[in-house]
Each structure stands twice: as C-alpha cells, then as structure tokens.
From Swiss-Prot:
Monomer. This is Phosphoglycerate kinase. It is an enzyme of class 2 (transferase). It holds the Pfam family PGK. One of its GO terms (biological process) is glycolytic process. It is found in: Cytoplasm. One of its GO terms (molecular function) is phosphoglycerate kinase activity. It catalyses: (2R)-3-phosphoglycerate + ATP = (2R)-3-phospho-glyceroyl phosphate + ADP. It comes from Shewanella baltica (strain OS195).
Amino acid sequence: MAIINMSDLDLQGKRVLIREDLNVPVSNGVVTSDARLRASLPTIELALAKGAAVMVMSHLGRPTEGEYNPEYSMQPVVDYLAKALSCPVRLATDYLDGVDVAVGEVVVFENVRFNVGEGKNNEALSQKMAALCDVYVMDAFGTAHRAQASTHGVGMFAPIACAGPLLAQELDALGKALDNPARPMVAIVGGSKVSTKLTVLESLSGIVDQLVVGGGIANTFIAAAGYNVGKSLYEADLIDEAKRLVANAKSRGADIPVPTDVVVAGEFSPTAAATLKSVSEVADGEMIFDIGPDSAEALAKIIESAGTIVWNGPVGVFEFDQFGEGTKRIAQAIADSKAFSIAGGGDTLAAVDKYGIADKVSYISTGGGAFLEFLEGKELPAVAMLEKRGA
C-alpha cells in the first residue's frame, strides 16, 4: 500500500490535524471508559514531539447533525486529555473559518457531527477542514469504513494526507492476518445471525483452513446438518446458504465443524439451569446457549495447531457464566497459542476482557464495523483515500 505514514514526516512548525476515534461513553460529564483515548495518546504525543501545532477532531455519540447539543460535547474528552498530556489542551467550538494553535499545544475541535454535511461527506465542509492544516492525519480505524467529511473528504483536499500510527498498525496487523497468513489459518465467527455476517462467512470460507462458527450462527449450521435446534435462535431461510458454505469449504479442503455437544436451557435468563446434551438430543422446548466441553476441546486443538487466528464473536452467551465455558476455553486456547492472533468486535473484546487475555492476543482491533468490512474484503473509503493521496 502506497500510504504516507505520519511517523515518516517532518512536522516541525506544521499545523497537523488528526482525526481520531474519541467516541467514548460519558456519564455526568465524565468519561467512563477511556480505552480509545488511551489508544490515541501515542499519536498525539508523537506529533507534539515532532514540533507540530496539533488539532484533534472526532465524533462523539449520535447527535442530530448540524445541531449543538451539550450532551455530545467533546469537553469531557478535553478534560481527560488535559490531564493525560503534559501540554495545554483546549476546546475550539467555532473552528471552520480558522483557529489559532501554537506549536506544543493541542486544540480539540467540537464534535464533528455538529457540522452540517459531515455524514454526507460535503465538499465545501471538507475543503474548510483541509484549509486549517498543513498535514491531515487519519488515525481512526473505527470510522475508516465511512466516507464522511472528517474521515475522507478533508483528506482529498489537505496539502498532505497520511496515516497515523494507530491506523498504520491496524492495517499492518489485518494485512498480516489476511493477505499472507501463516497456515493453518483459523477464523472464529460468532454472533446471533448468519444474515449479519454472511459476507464475512463467504469471504473467510474462501481463505481459511478452519472456519469455526459460534452463537446463533452455529445454530443455523447445526440445523443445516440435520439436527433439531428446538427453540434456539436460528435462521431457517439461510439453511441452504449454510449448506452451500460447508460444501464450498470442503471442496477446497477446508472445514466448518459443527458442535458435537451443546449446553441448553429452557429460557434465556441469568438464572437459567444449564444442561449438557449431545447435539442430536436437543428437545423441542430447549435453546442452545453454548458449545459443550467435547466441542470446546476439539476447537481448542484446532486453535493450538493454527498459524493465524482471526476471532470475531463469542461461541456462546458468555455474559451468563453457565453458558460461558465454551468461549472461555476458546479464549484460553488463543492465549496459549503461538499463532499470530487478531481479535475484533465489541462482544469479542468484552470476552477478551472477561477472561483476561488482552496481553496474549497479538493484535486487538479497535474497529467494529471497519474490522468486519475489512474481513469481508471491502475497500475502506478512508484507506482508499490515503492510497490515492500517497500514490
């Protein structure tokens, strides 16, 4: 990829505009989860160390576009950054017609979604943003799949458009996992519905050696294999699709294994009693909420021998401990594996946290939708823009 990297540029005395993903939860004016803010700090600190005058922009929440709403103000983010960085940090509310920023200072722009035209990638808005800087840095992988004024349009008009360290790191990790993976390659795709991940399953079934399906997705594959799934969440209209994916994988020597044992209950609740059953013994009134220990061990063995692991989605309802053993075993196997592993998606990251394996996963992706679209083989607009500007 012919993308310019911020780390390679001379930024001394330059006005540098960084698009970060600082969309964090806020309660009573205080940031309640700072993972994205912490992830952005090295990029901001590097720009400061290189002698830049730094401007930072992001969206926060989903305000009505074009309307100021104090509930979605960037002020709590500014307060956090002011403590985390050893330099002056301030909020700029009216910045589109120009903003004063000194070398060694950080100015955070108010929520980009307060600007009319942000979502539609408005050209006039993009040009105004571009006019504010000498160098535009796209560092928000989580929004790279959206063609918006602050993620795409501005980069088309800025004097220089480059990738920040966080984005570059993400693209390197995904490239390593998907473009030239060490074999065998194993993908674990969980989630409630085949329909929401069909293109991911399609894409991965063409490149992996083993495609492990979990959650509601697995129920559709279990039904496709001819077993009763009782009252489980599954998609009857996608059984033929599941059969086709299994046949396609087999035709190229790959496999989509179906669980041999499952954990069931009569209701979906934190207090539901879990029962272990063979996959062939699920009764009409039961729901499958996890894979059984035999299936978990079989999958752990597959993971242990892998060269590359891509994990997107749990294999059971791990939020309830009685249905979490399958996901826990998978997490342990990934942690113990010597393979290059990449994990992404909200539920997956919650499982990584719950089972304490964050430091054992080679790379944790910060992008939800962008991670999925990359797995689908789709071109991400922000990445395409950076390639065009780098050519």
